From Swiss-Prot:
UniProt similarity note: Belongs to the paralemmin family.
Biological processes annotated in GO: cell differentiation
Protein name, as recorded: Paralemmin-3
Motif position, Nuclear localization signal: 579-583
Keyword Phosphoprotein: yes
């Protein structure tokens, strides 16, 4: 403490006398420089005396560390030995004689002198230790403190070696224990969990912060393994196998999988259900594609594109036709109730592929499905922006209005006479392409007629009872339909009719004559004629039945002129019948 006080006092005096940043020659000129040099000499003597004391008191404990620590001091004191400090030099040489360290210092100058080619009493590499010596001179107390601390550590090691050995032994054995646990339980899926629970019971603080992370990892891997191997093997046919696995874990109260249940259940259900619907749709679409490609005429290439829009529901049109005639009077009374019902999933209809079985068993089911689809789609229809899905669902509604034309004997006779006329093929094809460009729903209805004709050709013997039943239904419903159309026409004359509704009526009236071609032809010869001449005659009938299809057919529907009678195809229906068709179509659109 006295040395530190003297040093601080000298520094303060120097700063006061010479300034904070003294010039390089000011230290030599200042009177305090002599006092500082004396302080440094006294510090060095103290260090040497303290080291000798330590060696004499406990030589066995200090020797291993004293060798490593005192080499710079010995080198520095050898340097000062040439400076004229004789007493210090004798003490240091006596200490070197006791240590074997002095032999190393005697050998070093000879080798380095040979390398350098100089024979100097103070070799050049030893000059590198001079800045360390200056640091020691500047901070002698720190040096002494470090030496005392190391001596105390040596004493502690000698006093309690058993604790240190146990600590080192535990640190060495920790990785081995981990390896043993992991090697034993690689096949077992809960090995790390068991090891962690043992460490928690023992209170091992080092592994506690890893517990949650490792537990979640192990449970996720365990769940993925079980989901990959046993879940797929046992429950390939069952859709809810993974859900059963999760419920078993919940019953066992496995806390590790608790936070994963909801997420995985939602993912699995979302992944399982849409795949079923997609597979059913793909099957029905593939079968319908094969039937269409085998039996379509090659003259009309654009029909294949439009037929893909109405694939799903054209499979079931045969039985739906009969049901629609039955339910037409019942629909208009119950539209307000059924508008707010939810649509049944569309996957119900594609699964029912056999029209024969539908006629016998599934009449009531198809009634409900068809009525809900018709009324919901008519309520939600936008006449200018019709998506393909709505077009495919509105086909049944277009068929519904086919019952109006059954009450008209003139339309029936003309529709039967159309395929028999000797019409040229080139204007018919031009008409079909123009109508396809104008509205895609026309080609959908052509595809409907083709599929119905194919079904009739396949059924063969079942055609006659169906056609007879349809004739009876048409006769029964003709009177009711005329009355309802008159009543609804009065209501619609009061309400303003926009151009968009009239244009949708045209597209919806164009499907009127298509069912008559097939359902009224009970003879198989006439059926074959209708199936052969059907695409051409149906396009002409569609273009001729609506108003405004005569002159500007190349233009879109929004720009068609209204009020001109059709001149192509020879269909000369009266204006009153066409007005009645228009008004029934308006009713459906408004409802």
């Amino acid at each position: 403490m006295s040395l530190q006080q003297l040093k601080r006092k000298s520094l303060r005096d120097g700063w006061l006398m010479d300034g904070v940043v003294p010039s390089p020659g000011a230290e030599i000129d200042s009177p305090l420089f002599q006092t500082e040099s004396k302080i440094q000499q006294l510090e060095k003597e103290l260090e040497s005396l303290q080291m000798q004391q330590l060696r004499l008191e406990n030589p066995a404990a200090v020797q291993p560390e004293a060798k490593a620590i005192q080499t710079p001091f010995l080198n520095g004191e050898k340097i000062q030995q040439g400076g004229g400090q004789a007493g210090d030099a004798k003490e240091v040489t006596a200490g070197q004689a006791n240590n074997t360290h002095g032999i190393i210092h005697e050998e070093q100058p000879t080798k380095e002198d040979q390398d350098m080619g100089t024979v100097l009493p103070i070799p050049a590499p030893r000059g590198k230790t001079v800045p360390k010596e200056d640091e020691n001179q500047a901070n002698p107390e720190l040096k002494v403190d470090m030496e005392h601390q190391k001596v105390e550590l040596v004493d502690l090691i000698q006093e309690c070696p058993v604790e240190n050995q146990t600590v080192e032994h535990v640190e060495k054995n920790k990785p081995h224990l981990d390896q043993e646990h992991t090697e034993k339980n690689q096949d077992g899926q809960h090995g790390i969990l068991e090891f962690l629970t043992q460490d928690q019971q023992l209170g091992n603080p080092n592994l506690q912060h890893l517990d949650r992370y490792l537990i979640t990892e192990v449970t996720v891997k365990h769940f993925e393994k079980n989901q990959a191997h046993p879940g797929q093997e046992k429950n390939q046919d069952e859709q809810h196998g993974i859900l059963k696995y999760l419920t078993q874990d919940q019953q066992n109260e496995n806390p590790n999988l608790g936070h994963l249940d909801q997420y995985l259940i939602t993912e699995i259900t979302l992944q399982s259900n849409p795949l079923e619907n997609i597979s059913v749709h793909d099957q029905t679409q593939s079968t319908s594609d094969q039937n269409m490609e085998t039996k379509l005429p090659t003259d009309i290439p654009q029909q294949k594109e439009s037929q893909s829009e109405g694939k799903i529901q054209t499979k079931d049109q045969g039985p739906e036709f009969e049901l629609l005639y039955k339910d037409h009077s019942h629909e208009k009374g119950t539209t307000d109730q059924t508008q707010h019902q939810e649509l049944l999933p569309s996957s119900i209809e594609p699964k029912e592929e056999n029209p024969k079985a539908q006629d016998e068993k599934l009449d009531h089911h198809n009634e409900s499905v068809s009525t809900v689809h018709e009324q919901k789609e008519v309520h939600d229809m936008d006449p200018r922006q019709l998506s393909t899905h709505q077009k495919s669902l509105s086909i049944s509604e277009d068929q519904n209005q086919g019952s109006v034309s059954l009450s008209d004997p003139q339309n029936q006779d003309q529709s039967l006479a159309l395929p028999e006329k000797g019409l040229e093929e080139t204007p018919q094809l031009n008409l079909s392409h123009e109508v396809q460009c104008e509205e895609p729903s026309l080609m959908e209805q052509i595809s409907i007629s083709l599929l119905q004709s194919m079904e009739q050709n396949q059924e063969g013997a079942d055609q006659t009872p169906k056609s007879v039943a349809l004739e009876e239904l048409s006769e029964l419903l003709s009177s009711d339909m005329i009355k309802q159309s008159v009543l609804l026409s009065k209501n619609l004359e009061e309400s303003p009719s926009t151009a968009s509704t009239e244009e949708t009526q045209e597209t919806m009236c164009q499907a009127v004559i298509i069912p008559d071609l097939k359902k009224e032809n009970s003879d198989p010869e006439v059926v074959q004629e209708s199936s052969s001449h059907e695409p051409m005659s149906s396009t002409i009938a569609q273009s001729s039945s609506a108003e405004g299809n005569s002159s500007p057919e190349s233009r879109p529907l929004l720009q068609k002129s209204q009020g001109t009678d059709s001149q192509q195809g020879g269909n000369t229906a009266t204006q009153q019948e066409e007005r009645r068709k228009k008004k029934t179509c308006q009713c459906c659109v408004v409802m």
